[in-house]
């Protein structure tokens, strides 16, 4: 079975680029690598980081420069015609998914969309700054053969007639062989995210200010397009000036894992997510998560992987109490690693992926045309 995907940042993660960032793209790398290890033929199209026609294979995943001489959709069409995949894969809300899915269906390629945020499936909330592009994106969801969800709560956001094609695809994090015991850790609370309004860095600052004896390590660069000038300047000034905040700016992926693995707690102040990949990174490192709101499928509460606090006051109390109890953190860390190993391993994700594919393939019928031989390599037809 062959699957294709287009994403330059996935290539960045695969090559160890320290500038790579984005939970969706990091997951895209883990998933494509896991599928390749399971015997899938996986090709990731790269628009800019590789020259057109240049190839590189990393951990079984083939990266191919596809160029973008005119418009992405033309590159997509050429890519699908040349590769002849069984499936194409797409992540995150994007107006291009509508026409991209339609092109794939026309060529007889099955379509899999993977949601990476709850808002991806809430059409009245998604793409709030580009509302006029919601319709083509919604068309892409309609034309998707499979919609992968991160947690079961996301299924409820879909219209009832789309819910039957929604399948849970668990996040992936390869467990490190060893972790640092909590009694040997650095006694820090780590907060790691791209700094944008939905991550609520203002709440992080308030919590840190009210816990002056606890050290916070903060990683992440601001996403300036999401902010007005005044608020982000104030946020950054406070992050750099509070004496108990160690602000690191953008942190390379491998260094971020080390910081999380050395910390006593991971703090989430976000008010909207899907299933944060950084939760898996924390749990895999044996670091409990203290989350103000986010708790997909109630995993933190039900499995003892940290604490869900609901209020700033509750967060302050949870951080204060857990920082004083290394044995309790150690117990939570053991449960966290066990949970990741059982539910979020590459093997578990591939099993879920293939179950969904098999269910759809049994009832699937092809689109208008299946890779006409006469057109496949004809530049005149492109």
Regions found by a protein language model. Give the residues of each.
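Conserved donor-binding/catalytic core segment of Leloir-type glycosyltransferases
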Residues: 4, 181-199, 205-211, 217-219
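Nucleotide-activated donor-binding/catalytic signature segment of Leloir-type glycosyltransferases, i.e.
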Residues: 230-251
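Short hydrophobic beta-strand element within catalytic cores of glycosyltransferases
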Residues: 288-291
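Helix-loop-beta element that forms the nucleotide-linked donor phosphate-binding surface
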Residues: 154-173
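A short, well-ordered alpha-helix in the C-terminal region of glycosyltransferases
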Residues: 321, 328-343, 349-355
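Aromatic "clamp/platform" in nucleotide-sugar-dependent glycosyltransferases that forms part
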Residues: 93, 271
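Membrane-proximal helix-turn-helix segments that form the acceptor-binding/catalytic region
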Residues: 106, 130-147
């Amino acid at each position: 079975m062959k699957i294709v995907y287009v994403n330059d940042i996935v290539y960045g993660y695969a090559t160890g680029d320290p500038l790579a960032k984005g939970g969706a793209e990091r997951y895209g790398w883990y998933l494509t690598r896991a599928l390749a290890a399971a015997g899938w033929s996986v090709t990731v199209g790269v628009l800019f980081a590789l020259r057109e026609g240049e190839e590189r294979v990393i951990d079984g995943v083939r990266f191919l420069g596809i160029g973008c001489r005119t418009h992405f959709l033309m590159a997509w069409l050429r890519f699908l015609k040349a590769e002849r995949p069984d499936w194409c894969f797409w992540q995150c809300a994007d107006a291009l998914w509508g026409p991209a899915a339609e092109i794939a269906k026309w060529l007889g390629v099955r379509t899999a969309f993977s949601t990476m945020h709850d808002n991806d499936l809430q059409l009245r909330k998604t793409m709030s700054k580009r509302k006029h592009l919601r319709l083509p994106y919604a068309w892409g969801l309609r034309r998707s053969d499979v919609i992968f969800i991160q947690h079961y709560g996301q299924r409820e956001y879909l219209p009832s007639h789309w819910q039957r094609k929604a399948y849970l695809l668990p996040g992936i994090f390869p467990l490190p062989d060893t972790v640092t015991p909590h009694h040997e850790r650095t006694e820090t609370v780590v907060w790691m995210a791209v700094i944008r309004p939905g991550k609520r860095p203002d709440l992080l600052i308030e919590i840190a200010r009210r816990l002056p004896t606890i050290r916070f390590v903060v990683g992440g660069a601001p996403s300036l397009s999401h902010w007005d000038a005044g608020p982000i300047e104030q946020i950054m000034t406070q992050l750099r000036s509070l004496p108990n905040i160690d602000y690191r700016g953008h942190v390379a992926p491998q260094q971020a894992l080390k910081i999380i693995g050395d910390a006593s707690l991971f703090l989430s102040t976000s008010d909207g997510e899907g299933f944060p990949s950084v939760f898996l990174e924390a749990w895999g490192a044996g670091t409990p998560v203290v989350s103000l709101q986010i708790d997909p499928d109630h995993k933190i509460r039900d499995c003892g992987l940290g604490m869900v606090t609901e209020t700033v006051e509750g967060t302050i109390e949870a951080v204060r109490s857990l920082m004083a109890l290394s044995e309790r953190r150690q117990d939570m860390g053991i449960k966290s690693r066990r949970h990741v190993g059982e539910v979020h391993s590459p093997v578990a994700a591939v099993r879920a992926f293939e179950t969904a594919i098999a269910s759809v393939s049994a009832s699937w019928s092809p689109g208008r045309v299946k890779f006409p031989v006469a057109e496949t390599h004809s530049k005149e037809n492109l």
